[in-house]
Amino acid sequence: MSYFEHIPEIRYEGPQSDNPLAYRHYDKSKKVLGKTLEEHLRIAVCYWHTFVWPGVDIFGQGTFRRPWQQAGDAMERARQKADSAFEFFSKLGTPYYTFHDTDVSPEGSSLKEYSENFLRITDYLARKQEDTGIKLLWGTANLFSHPRYAAGAATSPDPEVFAFAATQVRHALDATQRLGGDNYVLWGGREGYDTLLNTDLMRERDQLARFLHMVVDHAHKIGFKGSLLIEPKPQEPTKHQYDYDVATVHGFLLQHGLEKEIRVNIEANHATLAGHSFHHEIATAYALGIFGSVDANRGDPQNGWDTDQFPNSVEELTLAFYEILKHGGFTTGGMNFDSKVRRQSVDPEDLFYGHIGAIDNLALAVERAAVLIENDRLDQFKRQRYAGWDADFGRKILSGDYSLSTLATDALARGLNPQHASGHQELMENIVNQAIYSGR
């Protein structure tokens, strides 16, 4: 059965095309800085928003009537969901996908049933991957939707909940390994608190650290060669989450000896919820040595929650890719669309429109970021701005040759009277805009 029979394969037709079911900028074989756009982007489509979400919100019921969600038997629905997903991936021409365990497989009424269902669906997904050549960017476990996780999973006050969550992660990590996934993601959706009045903060942080060590140990045990990634988010659904932002995650990893084992998966909308730019979080992750992968989406500046809209700002994406390309590009990570169509976008075509537009925006951003790297004007100015630190005096300060006292004595002896030099922010912004809008 075809779920998108009337939709053709999406192909590149160039900027002049008026075909809404074609790429205008994403020519996957086009080379930029020595790699194809497909290699730079490593695009993935997520299972949950695209094939699971029924179009509900807190004020209304689901608006979507997806044909793959109609079968009476839960396992048959799971197989139909996989059929529709891989047909979609194939027509869109995207090389990767991502999932939560309960996106792809029915949870069942017991842990035993959950495990059996998941094993069977993993085999089914393996066959779909073999038939299509589509690969798994990352897998994860849903440790936030079921009522048992209302007070958290690893941070739950109930050790039985912790154990249930550990079982899910064990199976999800095993499935990711079985399917050749490049990463495994840990999103602490309810690893946080709603009020400190009933929360033992230190205990919960220790529990979370123990859980992460168990995950790392299991990954080593099964020979998982991919990256383990935490996805930071400041709040929602809890008031405060322990993986607030990239810097917070890094501090937690350092505290618990995990900084060499786990990196971050950065979501654009989570960055803005934390009061940061997408650019900031990516740059911070690279500065701290924990950059892993990206969830591509955007929020609404007028809304204080995670709207998971498709990314449509080439300006924002260019700055993100400027950081990524400067550091050599993705290794195991990629660009996963943690994005969903709006509740009113009920036609099957809308799923394609959202992804096509976003993929075109990513392609443009890679090309514009490459211009910034090739003309080198931003980095050239930075090198000039910090040149004093590369000279003898600056190097001696950083190498520890001076104490606070001897540096003060030297400053007095030199009669230092430094004058401020312009930061040229406006010029830097003009250089970025010239690259984006003029391509040079």
Curated annotation (Swiss-Prot):
Mg(2+) 2 binds at residues 267, 270, 306, 308. It catalyses: alpha-D-xylose = alpha-D-xylulofuranose. Mg(2+) 1 binds at residues 231, 267, 295, 338. It is found in: Cytoplasm. Its EC number is 5.3.1.5. Its cofactor is Mg(2+). This is Xylose isomerase. It comes from Paraburkholderia xenovorans (strain LB400).
